[in-house]
Amino acid sequence: MTCILGIETSCDDTCVAVYDTNNGVIFNQVYSQSQLYNYYGGIVPEFSARKHLEILIVLLKNIFKKGKISKNLIDAVAYTAGPGLVGSLLVGASVGTALAYSLKVPVVLVNHMEAHLLTPMLENIKPTFPFLALLVSGGHTQLINALGIGEYELLGETLDDAVGEAFDKVAQALGLGYPGGSNLSKLARSGIPGTFNFPRPMINNSNLNFSFSGLKTFVLNIIQKNNNDFQIKANIAREFENAVVDSLVIKCIRALKKLKYTTLVVSGGVSKNDVLRMHINRIIKQYNYKVFYSHLKYCSDNAAMIAYVGSIRYKKFKSLNLEIKINPNWSIVDLAKI
């Protein structure tokens, strides 16, 4: 049995978890800063780092007190080393390294995007390699050829705004506050289909890249030309969401055909979007493919996925060198560069 304590502080959520290779996730706690950023309309990196520093120690104490987990059970401390916000990453790395030192255990550095990609492995029914992965979050939109653990090939990515970023900016223009993506999706449910017709970016391009900046600008112009009527806002939200989802689904099917794969994994914060899941499920059934998602509680940032990947990388990549390491731009396709 291997027991890994995980720490995730790459952006604005402070997360801790413990993963046991025999029993799975035995402790998982997330502190969200979203209410703080509703006032600002988005994340303020310096505030995020300060809040991590304030909250992380409290959450770690909860592992041993509320979770009643003995410190002697911990075999290693895994923390997110990138990609992410510099200040936020440094808090997790510093505290994680100090904790490992105090427990006399090694550290394991985990790539945030690899952790998202592998989160469906926490479920009872797991995907098998190789498969196509769609990673969709506030900062990333990528299509990955997943050949095996640690073996990833980038097939396509956004050339500008990530999906989550585009959602947040359109939501802000609609006056929906932060977090924008979930608020926009709620509003979209009241929208009347077919009222607007927005472009589906790059769907006619043969490559597997995405682009959402043009769509975002197009929608922002539509918002400016219309009044603040609730129904109009809902109609705009619905068509924008459909345009984004269509773009993602079309590229996924194109990539699956290109690779001659039959398995798709969808991970990241945006993967909990019910419209995205509905469209993917429909098209996957049509082609007789298989699709795997993260559990809804593991779609957004969490430390369970960090602890899990830490358990996989433990034997090969654990380090007793307690030098604090982060890489804000750490790519999933170049895991050796940390």
From Swiss-Prot:
<keyword id="KW-0012">Acyltransferase</keyword>
<dbReference type="GO" id="GO:0061711">
    <property type="term" value="F:N(6)-L-threonylcarbamoyladenine synthase activity"/>
</dbReference>
<comment type="function">
    <text>Required for the formation of a threonylcarbamoyl group on adenosine at position 37 (t(6)A37) in tRNAs that read codons beginning with adenine. Is involved in the transfer of the threonylcarbamoyl moiety of threonylcarbamoyl-AMP (TC-AMP) to the N6 group of A37, together with TsaE and TsaB. TsaD likely plays a direct catalytic role in this reaction.</text>
</comment>
<feature type="binding site">
    <location>
        <position position="116"/>
    </location>
    <ligand>
        <name>Fe cation</name>
    </ligand>
</feature>
<dbReference type="InterPro" id="IPR017861">
    <property type="entry name" value="KAE1/TsaD"/>
</dbReference>
<keyword id="KW-0963">Cytoplasm</keyword>
<dbReference type="GO" id="GO:0005737">
    <property type="term" value="C:cytoplasm"/>
</dbReference>
<keyword id="KW-0819">tRNA processing</keyword>
<keyword id="KW-0808">Transferase</keyword>
<keyword id="KW-0479">Metal-binding</keyword>
<keyword id="KW-0408">Iron</keyword>
<feature type="binding site">
    <location>
        <position position="168"/>
    </location>
    <ligand>
        <name>substrate</name>
    </ligand>
</feature>
<feature type="binding site">
    <location>
        <begin position="135"/>
        <end position="139"/>
    </location>
    <ligand>
        <name>substrate</name>
    </ligand>
</feature>
<dbReference type="Pfam" id="PF00814">
    <property type="entry name" value="TsaD"/>
</dbReference>
<dbReference type="InterPro" id="IPR000905">
    <property type="entry name" value="Gcp-like_dom"/>
</dbReference>
<dbReference type="InterPro" id="IPR022450">
    <property type="entry name" value="TsaD"/>
</dbReference>
<dbReference type="GO" id="GO:0002949">
    <property type="term" value="P:tRNA threonylcarbamoyladenosine modification"/>
</dbReference>
<comment type="similarity">
    <text>Belongs to the KAE1 / TsaD family.</text>
</comment>
<feature type="binding site">
    <location>
        <position position="181"/>
    </location>
    <ligand>
        <name>substrate</name>
    </ligand>
</feature>
<dbReference type="InterPro" id="IPR043129">
    <property type="entry name" value="ATPase_NBD"/>
</dbReference>
<feature type="binding site">
    <location>
        <position position="301"/>
    </location>
    <ligand>
        <name>Fe cation</name>
    </ligand>
</feature>
<feature type="binding site">
    <location>
        <position position="273"/>
    </location>
    <ligand>
        <name>substrate</name>
    </ligand>
</feature>
<feature type="binding site">
    <location>
        <position position="112"/>
    </location>
    <ligand>
        <name>Fe cation</name>
    </ligand>
</feature>
<dbReference type="GO" id="GO:0005506">
    <property type="term" value="F:iron ion binding"/>
</dbReference>
<protein>
    <recommendedName>
        <fullName>tRNA N6-adenosine threonylcarbamoyltransferase</fullName>
        <ecNumber>2.3.1.234</ecNumber>
    </recommendedName>
</protein>
